[in-house]
């Protein structure tokens, strides 16, 4: 059975995408810790982070840096935290989380957001990515 992320990638479930290329996608998480919280995911359904092919892992990190710059431009956080947890969904993924302090990286702070809130955040982030010249934010 495909993971929930694969189902989002395939369009079977809704997702508020901010990045799509041949290897990875990024979309807003439905339970953000803070506004601008993004999930960055390889298209290939791989459970464990350490099983992701090296070239894909390198690409994930390059894209993570680009999205981080856009998050900083859009929301002006002190930092953008990057977390690889891997417990809730058996599909490797990175969390990019705008943060003002270490406590902002606690999943205990996650709260469900409305579709409208997620769409607005995605629109803001795509605009910041486009301002950086990132074509992968357009599809």
Predicted segment positions?
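HIT superfamily nucleotide-processing domains
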Residues: 1-139
